[in-house]
């Protein structure tokens, strides 16, 4: 707690001032977390001061809040290119990232509990920079980081604004941003070192070395490229759902089975089901083999039944036997190929069709989906054309 508080003071995050009249004063609290390494071991214990952003009033102490993050398909595309050209892939972390964003609004906050000024106990903090928990915190941080990168000569992609590229002479660098977690890949290590040094002038940058663990995804170097999987995340999910002793199944769903909102008895408490399906949805980042099953389960979050819960547990049982399944990125061709398909009126509840597509860059799968169409197709041809339209839109 003391280290976090001192970091806030060093960063000139606020200055004390008398409590204003007719102004909203945001409360705060301390949040404690255990940071883990990729193997599940404890890295460090962390305390963070978090503002209670729900105290904020729209138009008074915040306006714009949107902040982009890197798209999963962009990450896969960049890693495929890095493997193909044998580029270095490094991971960076910015300490206390949200504290670097400059606030445009006038925001007041109570003094942190346990660190009140003994001389001015009733004073409040006038925030000069952002702090965790504020509604605009992610946006202010992204704007600050993107400005720093553009001053170094980087350009934001028009397709994915969290991808920044630098091209000069023979040097090429890609920077992928997900809040304060950053992937950097380049054709030269010297360029990466220079970037880290330049960013270090403004931020506390940690070079985490070769990419190995990013957003819960484990990245392993293989003889021909990279292997991405979420084995640790899947194991943690099985523990959380008390299914470590479950018998594995060979498939995530029963072939030909159709889930209906009318089948089974409604669950008295749908919390477990919703938590389970939400976690499974995150696993689809590296598990296209469960995308269809998870898409079906997501359609019953509002009123799940015991039949739906059994279907969700079947996916977990499938994961139990396929923990190391994931994506393999190998060197090879850079030809872009897309494949799509659709059923027709397959949903028993509303007779809408389900589309699916896979997009490969060479042999590397970089994008996929399984999704119910938004309208009822009047023929199988129409359903196929709609599926093709979504695929082409993703390609271009």
Each language-model region and where it sits:
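Long, low-complexity, charge-biased intrinsically disordered regions
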Residues: 1-396
């Amino acid at each position: 707690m003391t280290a976090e508080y001192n970091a806030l003071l060093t960063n000139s995050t606020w200055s004390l001032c008398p409590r204003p009249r007719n102004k909203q004063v945001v409360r705060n609290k301390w949040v404690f977390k255990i940071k883990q390494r990729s193997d599940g071991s404890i890295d460090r214990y962390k305390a963070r001061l978090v503002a209670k952003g729900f105290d904020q009033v729209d138009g008074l102490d915040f306006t714009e809040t949107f902040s982009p993050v890197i798209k999963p398909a962009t990450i896969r595309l960049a890693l495929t290119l890095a493997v193909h050209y044998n580029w270095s892939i490094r991971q960076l972390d910015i300490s206390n990232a949200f504290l670097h964003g400059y606030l445009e609004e006038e925001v007041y906050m109570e003094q942190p509990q346990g660190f009140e000024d003994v001389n001015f106990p009733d004073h409040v903090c006038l925030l000069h920079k952002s702090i965790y928990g504020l509604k605009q915190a992610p946006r202010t941080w992204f704007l600050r980081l993107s400005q720093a990168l553009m001053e170094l000569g980087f350009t934001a992609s028009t397709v994915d604004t969290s991808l920044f590229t630098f091209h000069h002479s023979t040097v090429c660098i890609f920077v992928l941003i997900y809040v304060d977690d950053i992937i950097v890949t380049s054709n030269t290590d010297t360029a990466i070192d220079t970037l880290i040094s330049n960013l270090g002038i403004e931020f506390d940058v940690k070079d985490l070395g070769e990419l190995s663990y990013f957003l819960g995804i484990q990245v392993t170097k293989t003889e021909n490229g990279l292997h991405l999987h979420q084995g640790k995340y899947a194991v943690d999910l099985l523990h959380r759902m008390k299914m470590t002793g479950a018998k594995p199944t060979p498939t995530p769903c029963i072939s030909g089975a159709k889930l209906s909102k009318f089948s089974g008895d409604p669950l008295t408490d749908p919390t477990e089901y919703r938590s389970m399906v939400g976690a499974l949805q995150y696993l689809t980042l590296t598990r296209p083999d469960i995308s269809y099953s998870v898409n079906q389960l997501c359609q019953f979050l509002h009123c799940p039944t015991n039949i739906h819960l059994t279907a969700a547990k079947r996916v977990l049982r499938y994961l139990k036997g396929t923990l190391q399944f994931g994506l393999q990125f190998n060197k090879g061709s850079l030809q872009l190929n897309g494949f799509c398909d659709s059923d027709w009126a397959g949903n028993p509840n509303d007779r809408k069709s389900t589309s699916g597509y896979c997009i490969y860059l060479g042999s590397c799968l970089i994008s996929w989906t399984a999704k119910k169409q938004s309208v009822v197709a009047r023929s199988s041809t129409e359903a196929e054309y709609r599926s093709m339209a979504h695929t082409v839109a993703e390609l271009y």
